[in-house]
Amino acid sequence: MNKTKKIGMYTLVLMIFTSVFGFTNIPRSFYLMGYGAIPWYIISGILFFIPYAFMMTEFGAAFKDEKGGIYSWMEKSVGSKFAFLGTFMWYTSNIIWMVSVASSIWVPASNFLFGSDKTKEWELLGLSGSKLLGILGIILIITITYISTKGLKNISKIASIGGIFVTIANILLLVGGIIVLVGNGFTPAEPINFHAFVSSPNKNYTSIIGMASFMVFALFSYGGLEVVSGLVDEAENPIKNFPKAIKLSAIIISVGYCIAILFVGFFTNWNSILTVGNVNMANVAYIVLNNLGTQIGNVLGFSQGNAVILGNFFARFIGLSMLLALTGAFFTVIYSPIKQLIEGTPNKIWPKSWTKINKNNMPTNAMWIQCAVVVIIIALSAFGGKSASKFLDYLILMGNVSMTIPYMFLSIAFIYFKKKEYINKPIKIFKSYKSGAIWGIIVTFIIGFANIFTIIQPIIEENDYFSTVLQVAGPILFVIIGLILYARYKKKNKLNNKEDDSLLSKI
């Protein structure tokens, strides 16, 4: 009966790849730092993503039969209060991600339909800019929620399609980069030298604080691995396939980012391409890929007109690829986090109707409540008077910090997990408690360090207090809400402090 519901290893790899690897992070990173982004990706990969992936591997193998995902991991490693706050914080960061993507996903849609970002020109029934994007985002979230309630089969299928197209997009970038490099006599468009790897052509990222704060963008590029943790019990042969899928994905993603950023420089001169016109974080990916098509046309001897046509085709294809990739990730994020929140945390925290599972084994009521929350946030943000560009930028900034703080909960929990010898650990990548604790501390420090720099950078460099407040307010608000919910649960069920974990019982 359950065989049809199980997820194979390669499907799981594609789901992880879709959830973690963001193709747009490649041109965005090159836009912010040039080749200087590569060392930060290497540092973040070595000190954060790879050890973090190994931690998730050990967690997943040890708790392969648990349905609660990261809540179960943290609850059994540290305690219920710590686990609830970490899970709730992580869940709310995914709400922010959904709000951001529900509006920003229309940029790749525009590139697919029109060959360039024309979202600022869109107008319908008197609505334009962030207002129109907000309305479209609301329609999208409702549609995806409806389809997702029909079962995991639909989710895994759409997520896999997204992963396939992201893979094709990366192959296109790599092969295209080689063609341009060879066609130009092995002379990269952006000169390669030692200085290029330790500095940034972007004046906003030339200071120590600016360069260090870029680390949070690298960390964000590696984010999302824990989303699939809720699918351990849905995996085919989880004790073997889940850890293998995580390790394989971690290697592909880490190496892939660094190579891809290098290849962007083969066909993109930073000063010539990324300083002309209205280049921003939302559209830079399509500008870069449009340029790739144009440069390929040039080295192959196309006429200027045909080279431009090829560039537009590349922009359209990347638009389609990113549209499908983001849609695939959306389907995973719209289900897995709410599943872990509802099935992992104590049922009595939530109203009884929220925990009901439909015939497709989906928490339908909770998913529609989640949909309503996202719709309300989108509406409030869209009609707040900000331009589309600022609207997207603020949401991206807000998501960076909110998304990475929960990683600290998991890395701290891993230290406790390694210490508890009675927990059966089928896979031990970190062979001893000491090595696990050291890497747990390193990962926690790296995340905290990057977030602090990101938070203070707007004040120090631009005197922009609003950006700082925005990045700090979200996480604080969600922690307060989490504490209130847990306190209500504890009071209602007359739990005493002895049942709380020692780490957070004093909060």
What are these regions (language model features)?
Residues 2-6, 357-360, 404-456:
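C-terminal membrane-solvent junction of multi-pass transporters and transport-like membrane proteins
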Residues 25-133, 469-479:
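Extracellular loop-to-transmembrane helix junctions
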Residues 4-12, 134, 236-238, 248-253, ...:
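Loop-to-transmembrane helix boundary motifs in multi-pass membrane proteins
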Residues 72, 251-330, 351-391:
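TM-loop-TM module centered on a large, flexible mid-protein loop between adjacent transmembrane helices
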Residues 11-16, 114-152, 170-176, 370-373, ...:
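Transmembrane alpha-helical segments of multi-pass small-molecule transport proteins
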Residues 38-39, 121-125, 129-131, 160-307:
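Helix-loop-helix junctions that connect adjacent transmembrane segments
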Residues 134-190, 223, 246-251, 396-409, ...:
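Membrane-interface loop-to-helix entry segments
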Residues 1-39, 43, 49-57, 65, ...:
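Membrane-interface "cap" regions at the ends of multi-pass membrane proteins
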